[in-house]
Amino acid sequence: MTDKIKVGLIFGGNSSEYEVSIMSAHNIYEEIDTNKFDVYPMWITNDGYLADDADSRKVLDNPKMEVANPHKVANISNIIELKDRPEIDVFFPIVHGNLGEDGCLQGLFRVLDKPFVGDDVLAAAVTMDKEMTKILAQRAGVPVAKWIAVKRFEYNDPDNEKLDYEYVASQLGSDLFVKPSNQGSSVGVSHVTNEKEYKVALAEAFKYDDKVLVEETVHGTEVETAVLGNDKPIVAGVGQIINAKDSFYTYENKYDDDSTSTLEIPAKLPEGIVETVRKNALKVFQATECSGLARIDSMLRSEDNEVVLTEVNALPGFTNISMYPKLFEEIGIPYTDLITKLIDYAMERYDHKKTLLHKHD
């Protein structure tokens, strides 16, 4: 018998960030403290199947691997009663994108009555939706880029003024970003400056979501910080992204080891700006009711040095070049200890939830 905590490391999934998820899971699997935890990888294939234990371990070293006959998740109980795995004590989801970080998987864990790393259901759903994040950040006094949201029914109406580049430019300026509201890692994002580009960008973004944001372009430098904890979160230092391509931080820039973008940690910025980035991050983390972890991304606007929120990533990557673990390593929390803390915070929140009343006696 072992008294180690059994961790279900869930990764993969039917998402545009599928391979990123596998790379993150590989790193967590390699770095987790095996004196404290027994790890059981759980690979959800691109087709939505849950592979067995052997294949789930193999794919960690080969993200492009496919299986012919994976074990299908036929019902909820299969998650915790698979024949080749013991019952899991705590889940560590690293399924990026749709279903994995939008509250769906988190809701399943709540139904299973199991602790899990990362946001609870509400915060996961809110932070996945860029518009909802903006609304809550504004209420907390954190600056955000001006935006217009275009819903699917509006996009399908050829007479809707939001489809007119000239109208949108009159509200937000001619230099714009078009992005799916519920996607991460710059997937489906386009930079546009004219009518033709705008039409193409809308079509591209609507491939990924039923709501698209059109935002003013904030010229400056992308800065990021990381948050760890529940009621008394720790805010790391600030990192800065230097993009040699002189363009926005693309999906490839974020996850390609050969990317020409570099991460500067700590950022060489005035102390006042660093503290503003950190204070804003804490405000947003609490306003969106995050718990466990989040990476807060902002732009340092060049014209006035205002820190403008761009995104809350409540399930950040753990790849070789991911900013989240690097920021905590810089302040003295190494990768292995960070993983342990995340699991501890998951257990802490679960234990607290158990003290809440759910019915009136």
UniProtKB/Swiss-Prot annotation:
Entry-linked InterPro entries: ATP-grasp, ATP_grasp_subdomain_1, D-Ala_lig_Van_CS, D_ala_D_ala, Dala_Dala_lig_C, Dala_Dala_lig_N, PreATP-grasp_dom_sf
Family annotation (Gene3D superfamilies): 3.40.50.20, ATP-grasp fold, A domain, ATP-grasp fold, B domain
Gene source species: Lactobacillus johnsonii (strain CNCM I-12250 / La1 / NCC 533)
Lineage per the UniProt record: Bacteria, Bacillati, Bacillota, Bacilli, Lactobacillales
Transmembrane keyword on record: no
Family membership: Belongs to the D-alanine--D-alanine ligase family.
EC numbers: 6.3.2.4
Protein's pathway: Cell wall biogenesis; peptidoglycan biosynthesis
Compartments it resides in: Cytoplasm
Gene: ddl
Name listed for the protein in its UniProt record: D-alanine--D-alanine ligase
